[in-house]
Amino acid sequence: MNYQKLRILSYDSQFNLNEEYEKRFNSYSTIHTGISIFPFLNEQKVTSEKYELFYVPLPSMIEKAEKIKYNSEKLRKLSTSAKLPGIAQTKIFLSTMIDEIQSTNETEGIESTKYEIAEAIVNRETKNKSSKKRFEGIVNMYLNLNEMKFEYIKTKEDLKSIYVSLFDGESDIDEWPDGEFFRAGQVELKSNEKVVHRGVTSESEVNSAVTDLINFMNRKDLPFIEKCITAHYYLEYIHPFYDGNGRLGRFIMSSYLVRKLDPYSGLSISNAVNTNRAKYYKAFTEVSHPRNKGEMTHFILDLMDLIISGQEISLLQLEEAEGKIKHVLNYLDSLDDLTPAAINILFTLIQDNLFSMFTNMDDSDITAEKDISRYKLNPILKDLEEKGYIEKIKLKPSTHVITKKVIDEVAI
């Protein structure tokens, strides 16, 4: 028999809802979170009821957690494999990150383009402080994850600091928090003109709930995946800010999974959520339904499915990248009119073509990547150009790309 939601079982007239709830809640294996919610129904909080969030660690949950860890190990090995050269690794990561930011924006109805996000990456890499780009804050925070610069949440100030770093100066944040740390007023979420959630009411209640959340996040006695997912739900339940809560919550979840698993497991969350938006939002409303009485079991299972889905997409992309590199190496081995140094530079430009989303490496990028002087690079570029392997597309900064002849050879 499937482990059903309490809400679904309650529609059976022979079923005793309270008895089953007590059995689940008081089971020896049940995990109690110590954080509580008021349920939500018919556009209103049910303040006459309050439930502690809990979950039952079913065999299927343990199996999914193991699957996530197994996939993570595969991702870690693939993404750092010698079969994927450094340029390919960097470009694939940036492409994944751009998809992640684009997806988290789309989920919240924020209009953005991948080109805008790529511009913010370039601005950060060139340290251009005179021209601030849209999404610069969120791009910087996601890039920090790849550099192993993590945000730890020990206090309310830490949570507020992450929010400011993500969204400071962004035009799509309509209303900034007006309390000491968080919002002072009330907030509600609507879908098709219907209220689907009301955040924790007053500033003092928000502060108290955030303190409970932080205490929960820093518990050492819980499995980290289940804890991460539960914390994600509770942050969205609190809704401590007027705008940006969804993107904030998904960033924090990404950050935690990057730290505990690997970059690709963490940076595929929003893409999977955006693809399965209905499932994601339905999971939230189920936890909040009065008849489910605060049970998180199915929410955790649903979000584990999304994590696995994102991982599988990343695994496929990395495996395809390995196949492309193998094909390129076979092509390079067939060339008999180039020096090893020229083949090395051509390999660099082919990787740039295969894995860059928008911007090309310029010649100075090549010197930095290959640790070669311009004095030595220029004659190699000239030789490649004369033999029809590359062409110059820009004077300032000097930029070369592979020709159509090479593109046709390496395409698979």
Q: Each predicted region: which residue ranges?
A:
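FIC/Doc superfamily catalytic core
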Residues: M1-I412
